[in-house]
Structure formats: C-alpha cells, structure tokens
C-alpha cells in the first residue's frame, strides 16, 4: 500500500480500457473510507463528464465536479491561491508542513488535505490555454505537498504533448497501464514494459525513489459498488461547506460574478489603474481588507476585463483606463463598502 502524501503526486496513464478510471475510483474510495470530510476534500476535474461525476453527492467534495476545460483552468488558479494562503498561515504559525500545523490546532481549525483529481489531462492540454494549465499544474506539483495539496492526473494519451517533460519531472510517482507501444511506455515510466501488460488493471507502478517499476494488479471496483458507497455516505446527512476561495458554479457568466453595486469593487478598479498593476497584496494594503476579500475582488476585476488573467507570480496587467471604468459604472448607485474579510 502506498501513501499519497508521501508520493506526493501521482500520474496515471494507459490506453482506453486498461483500467485508469477504475484505478482512480479505487483511490478515491480508499481515501473516503478512511478519512472524514473534515480531514480531506476532493476537487474533481472530469472533462469526460461520466467517470467521476458520481461523487458529486458526497460531503468530501470541495466543489461540484468540473467538466469544462475553461472552468478547470480557473479552479486550478484558485487552488494555487489557496496554496499560497496556506503557506502564509504556516509561516505565521512557525511550522514547516501541514502535519505540524494541524497538531497545534483545535479540530475545527485544522486544515483539510486537498486531493485534485483530473481524469483526462489530454483535454486540458489540448485546450487553447494549455500553456497556462501546464504552468499551474507544475507550480502545484512543485510546492503544494507541504501544505497538504496533492495531484492525481490520469490520461489515455501518453504522448509528449500531454505528458510534457515539465509535468513528468514533477511527478516521480507514476502508474503505467497497458499501452500500444514501447514509446508510450517510456513516455510514462522511462522504461519499456507497459506495452506487454495484459490490461484490465495490470499495471507497472513507479514509486518515489524507486529505480525500477513494480508490476502489480489493481483492485476492481464496479459501478454498483461505487453507487452503494456514495449512497451510504450521502444518507448520513452530513453537510459540509464548500472550500472557500474555490470557484463553485458551472456555467457562470460575467454579469452574475461582477457586482457593480459593490462600492469596494469600484475602489479596487481605481487602485489597480492608479498603480498600473493588480495583485491581492496591493488591494489588501490600499483598501485595508483581508486576504479572502482581496482575492475575490481580483477575480471580479479579471471577469470584468479590468486586469489580465492569472500568470504565476507576476502582477496582473491592467488592460483598461479610467474612462472605461467610469463608463462601466455610469448609473450605478453607491453604498457603504463592506470591508469584511
């Protein structure tokens, strides 16, 4: 048995029907069997819309299952923001990892582990924003382990344009199911062998720090068993709050996300235009607000087209002028600003 926290991320690849999705189901099931929703939350990205949507009903979910590649990019950006927030909390507490942090906390203030499951990486890597997706995944893979965020990526296209060198370098733990050729096998585990597997759960597991892959066979979990597990957990009636700071609804549009009646939003527009850049820390300093409030305002500024999308550690570029903001707010009434964080 391998511990995901020690991997600390996992890459799964293999041909269609070789057992990838069953492996993902078994992994999720083993975690929800052992851990309460207070201790672990899942962010599931499933562009195929079929394999993992069954888990939407369980309280372990940090948000509804993501099915749109564009929404997936936003959610990955939100997880990077959550990672940075957790690093600040750990630094303020004087600890180096989530285990030490949680030992000092009461039960209700402990940080849950977050497991990000992507069932088809190829759909994200083939999207128009693949470079940004790769950058976000790489950033999380490099830094997220210490704050309890772990990635599990699966793909049925083990090619170099999907499993890039940058991604592979940050995923030392990998599982190769049956593939069509030696080239695909080497792309996944840097060795031949996966092309000779039998399928139906037969796999080669390359663990962190292990020079050679180990041949093992995965557990089979039927759809009926998964449904029974989900139904049992759902019937407990436990209600959990969604993860704060993670985009929630599918199919959101700009009109519903940007509240022009929020006076603090207009102040934020003027601050970023005056400083010719936008960042969460800038809004915190200039508006005297907390991190969560500032992060939400930055998201609103992006949706309104005031600042550029998230691009790693760079400050966001301001792409409108004051005249544009004045026109956008013409006719809106002012109210007392809510500066709560």
Feature names for model-found ranges:
Residues 1-7, 23, 29-30, 37-44, ...:
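P-loop NTPase motor-domain active sites and their immediate coupling elements
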Residues 10:
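Conserved beta-strand position immediately N-terminal to the Walker
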Residues 13:
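Residues at the beta-strand->loop junction immediately N-terminal to the Walker
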Residues 16-17, 155:
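The conserved Walker
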Residues 20:
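Conserved lysine of the Walker
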Residues 54-79:
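P-loop NTPase motor core
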